[in-house]
Structures are given as structure tokens and as C-alpha cells.
Swiss-Prot record:
Pfam families: Ribosomal_L5, Ribosomal_L5_C
Gene3D superfamilies tied to this protein: 3.30.1440.10
Protein name per UniProt: Large ribosomal subunit protein uL5
GO biological process terms, semicolon-separated: translation
Organism whose genome encodes this protein: Desulfitobacterium hafniense (strain DSM 10664 / DCB-2)
NCBIfam families: PRK00010.1 (NF000585)
Organism placement in taxonomy: Bacteria, Bacillati, Bacillota, Clostridia, Eubacteriales
GO molecular function: rRNA binding; structural constituent of ribosome; tRNA binding
A Gene Ontology cellular-component term: ribonucleoprotein complex
Length: 179
């Protein structure tokens, strides 16, 4: 079982129940899923770029990503409906907790000039979005083997009803918010 999952059930859930005075244990907010998305804009000209992004994302998450395709044609971008334009992975369960653990304890401290993540990126419904500028912060990615530095969006979907609950949950899980 994932280390962070144990910590959640033994320490974090009781602390959240105490703080927000939940009557029922099912009201306690928890991490539902983590979605990692990599937009590959250059895939319009270079179809090999998608393969590199898929490879990087599968190394980082340990799960095969799904290729996202364009929903509409946009002539200005030379984009047609159905063209591959990115990749994404949805993590749940133990894999999700292991990824979050690695992200917070290994990857984020490797970011240059890191002073914590913004606490303003909540969407009003208890979900948090984190943007990462380069995939090199993950130890699974070797510097010599990448073709291009790519960023990614990481979305933490929680069962929290408010941003305050979600902020408290992620803070207790170890998210390094700016002071």
C-alpha cells in the first residue's frame, strides 16, 4: 500500500474530520484522481513529437497515456479535426498516491528557484491545477534522451466542496504552498 495512502487514512482523515466538524466519515474530502496532460503543439508539423511525449509521460507515471485529438478544425493553426495534439494520463488508487508522493518529495524540490506552489490555482469546486515547465524535474527522465523540453499540467481532483477544504487536504498531504 502507498505510503501517502497510509498517512491519509491514519493521520490526515481524522485531522480533517476534527477541523471541519464532519459528522460522517464519507464527508471527509479525499483525493479522487490526478490527471496529467501534456499539450504537444508541434505535433501538427512533426508527428513523431507525440511518440516522444507518450514515452516521457509513461516513464513518469508508470501508465500508458492516451493520445488526445483535436475536436474542431482551426485553419489559422493548420489544425484538422481528429489530429493528435497531446497526451494525458488519469491516475487513481495506489498509483495516484505514489505519483503524488514522488511529485511532492522528489520532483518539486528539483525545480530551479522553487519557493512553493501558488495557492491561487483552485477552481472554486475543490480542484487544484499545477503547471510544470519542464519534464526534467522527474528523476525517471534522462537529460540526454529527451528531444525537447515539454511542460505539463497536473490536475488534482478532490471530493472537497470548497477550495478551503481542498487547500487543507493538499497541504496535509505535503503540497508545498507558498507562505
Amino acid at each position: 500500500m502507498a505510503r501517502l495512502k497510509d498517512k491519509f487514512s491514519s493521520e490526515i482523515a481524522p485531522a480533517l474530520q476534527q477541523k471541519f466538524n464532519y459528522k460522517n466519515v464519507m464527508q471527509i474530502p479525499k483525493l479522487e484522481k490526478v490527471v496529467i496532460n501534456v499539450g504537444v503543439g508541434e505535433a501538427i508539423q512533426n508527428s513523431k513529437a507525440i511518440d516522444a511525449a507518450v514515452g516521457d509521460l509513461s516513464k513518469i507515471t508508470g501508465q500508458k497515456p492516451v493520445v488526445t485529438r483535436a475536436k474542431k478544425s482551426i485553419a489559422a493553426f493548420k489544425l484538422r479535426t481528429g489530429m493528435p495534439i497531446g497526451t494525458k494520463v488519469t491516475l487513481r488508487g495506489d498509483r495516484m498516491y505514489e505519483f503524488v508522493d514522488r511529485l511532492m518529495n522528489v520532483a518539486l524540490p528539483r525545480v530551479r528557484d522553487f519557493h512553493g506552489v501558488s495557492d491561487k490555482a483552485f477552481d472554486g469546486r475543490g480542484n487544484y491545477t499545477l503547471g510544470i515547465k519542464e519534464q526534467l524535474i522527474f528523476p525517471e527522465i534522462e537529460y540526454d534522451k529527451i528531444d525537447k523540453v515539454r511542460g505539463m499540467d497536473i490536475i488534482f481532483v478532490t471530493t472537497a466542496k470548497t477550495d478551503e477544504e481542498a487547500r487543507e487536504l493538499l497541504g496535509m498531504l505535503g503540497m508545498p504552498f507558498r507562505k
